[in-house]
Regions:
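Tetratricopeptide repeat
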Residues: 14-15, 49-53, 74
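Short, charge/polar-rich alpha-helical segments
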Residues: 3-5, 38-41
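TPR/TPR-like alpha-solenoid repeats
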Residues: 36-39, 74-77, 81-84
Length: 91
């Protein structure tokens, strides 16, 4: 699934590549992108990952466990990325 076992790239680079292959709008993609946004905090990619996750979340079916979990991670990512501005998770 993740390619060559002898891959010398950093885990974050491999995670970003793996996340790009997830189905857009799936709970897996929202959760993965939100976690990656937190991990990339302080980099230009962090906000882009967060925004992509936010757009994907708009397609999630409400009321499922998977949606709740993904949206909770998205909320945490927003809180962590936007804490300084006081926007509390809202883009």
């Amino acid at each position: 699934m993740f390619g060559n076992r002898n891959d010398e790239r950093l885990p974050l680079q491999r995670a970003l590549e793996a996340a790009a292959s997830l189905k857009p709008g799936s709970w897996e993609s929202v959760e993965s992108l939100a976690v990656l946004a937190i991990e990339c905090k302080g980099t230009p990619e962090a906000e882009q990952l967060y925004q992509t996750a936010s757009r994907a979340a708009a397609q999630l079916k409400a009321g499922t466990y998977d949606a709740v979990r993904a949206l909770a991670w998205l909320s945490r990512a927003g809180r962590e990325l936007h804490a300084v501005s006081g926007r509390g998770g809202e883009p």
